[in-house]
Design a protein with these regions (language model features):
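Beta-strand-centric surfaces of beta-sandwich/beta-rich domains
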Residues: 26-398
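Sec/Tat signal peptide C-region and signal peptidase I cleavage site
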Residues: 21-25
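Bacterial N-terminal signal peptides
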Residues: 10-20
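Bacterial N-terminal signal peptides that target proteins for export
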Residues: 2-12
């Protein structure tokens, strides 16, 4: 009898736990589409756009002169930007999006917490255009000219968005929407959005580019100091994504580099990856276009091996990387940083307060490198032939 009573009590306890969990799940989010049905209070939709104030159809800003900075949105009070759309003329092949800078300032700060060339921020590398689709960012038709962001960007004491024209040319037409929610107060625990562009031309090892041990011994990476840094900030927050733009001057695979994360002042990384393509949720040295809401390859090199430009992205929507006091995210440029790569990134994260970003690369520093072409390869072959004694029947793989 005592045993049956115990079983009954246990069964009732389990039923109670399951009922509590079920009730809790109903109160909490069941998914994004479920959230859409919930009624909201205390919010007003607001928009700033380039609409023609006369009611005409010239729905773009007056031309930006070379070197001009202009505030396109200066929002007072409390709220959250939840959508940005921009398109620009002339097109990217005539007016590089790599030299138009977008900055965002939160809560009356004099320093930006978002600073990036506008193309790389939205998902357009170099001076190119192509369609790109992810959950928080996209660049849509026609042929990669409609740039959109759906990142939530909260502010308590105002927000300001600034554009700077560093192209050396005139921006003839700049169209935009900035949609935001006006609120009396922000929900609890809302962080501030940050985005930082960085760039490097990495240096090969003194013994050369020894990837896959083809030209020399492949040594371990015992000193992470040479890793490329894509986020380096102090404070509490969480990392939510990266756009990664790599231009390789060699047909060799560029992606043996591992990601390494130093969280809250760690001397050694607590998170270490197994390869660049693995970090971006792919495998085996891919070079095929692919799009997923959280990761993808919108632009691949289409050349011999991995020579040329590749754009990869990953957003940590379900798996943010959290930090309490600091984070430094790095990645090798090839195994043990053995490769020369023209590499740039835009990192996206939230912090409990808007902070100042590291210094931004200059126009000259971020200037895209030219493509390696067939004539360059023939010069390589000529130097190789001479190094091999210039035998008249040298083929190329001796």
């Amino acid at each position: 009898m005592r045993e049956k009573h115990t079983i009954l009590k246990t069964g009732l306890l389990l039923m109670g736990v399951m009922l509590a969990l079920s009730t809790s799940a109903q109160k909490e989010s069941i998914g994004e589409m479920f959230e859409l049905a919930k009624m909201k209070s205390g919010m007003k939709n607001r928009r700033i756009s380039s609409t023609d104030p006369t009611g005409g159809n010239r729905d773009h800003l007056e031309p930006f002169k070379p070197g001009e900075k202009r505030t396109i949105a200066d929002i007072k009070g409390t709220g959250a930007i939840n959508h940005i759309w921009i398109t620009i003329a002339p097109p990217p092949n005539e007016l590089s999006r790599n030299d138009i800078i977008i900055r965002m300032y939160w809560d009356g700060n004099e320093y930006p917490s978002v600073e990036s060339p506008i193309g790389p921020f939205f998902g357009q590398g170099w001076d190119e255009r192509y369609n790109y689709a992810s959950l928080p960012l996209s660049v849509g038709p026609e042929n990669g000219t409609g740039m959109s962001s759906y990142f939530t960007m909260p502010f308590e004491k105002g927000a300001r968005v600034e554009i700077e024209n560093q192209t050396g040319q005139t921006i003839n037409a700049f169209y935009f929407y900035i949609d935001y929610l006006e609120m009396k107060q922000l929900p609890e625990d809302m962080g501030r959005f940050h985005a930082w562009y960085n760039h490097t031309l990495s240096e090969a090892l003194p013994e050369g580019e020894t990837e896959w041990a083809l030209t020399g011994e492949q040594k371990p990476n015992t000193e992470e100091a040479r890793n490329y840094v894509f986020i380096d900030t102090k404070g509490k927050g969480h990392f939510v994504g990266i756009n990664y733009y790599v231009h390789s001057p060699t047909p060799m695979w560029y992606g043996e580099g591992d990601d390494m994360w130093f969280i809250d002042g760690e001397k050694s990384p607590s998170l270490i990856g197994t390869g660049t393509e693995d970090f971006f949720n792919t495998s085996w040295c891919p070079k095929e276009p692919f799009s997923h809401p959280h990761f993808g390859y919108p632009r691949v090199n289409n050349d011999v091996g991995w020579l040329g430009r590749t754009h990869v992205y990953r957003f940590f929507i379900n798996d943010p990387i959290f930090f309490e006091s600091a984070v430094k995210g790095t990645i090798e440029t090839g195994h043990n940083n053995n490769l020369t790569l023209d590499l740039s990134t835009v990192a996206y994260w939230y912090q409990d307060a808007a902070v100042m970003l590291p210094e931004a690369p200059t126009k000259e520093q971020r200037k895209p490198k030219p493509f390696i072409n067939h004539m360059d390869m023939h010069r390589w072959r000529d130097a190789w032939r001479k190094a091999k004694g210039n035998d008249p029947q040298l083929w190329g793989n001796e």
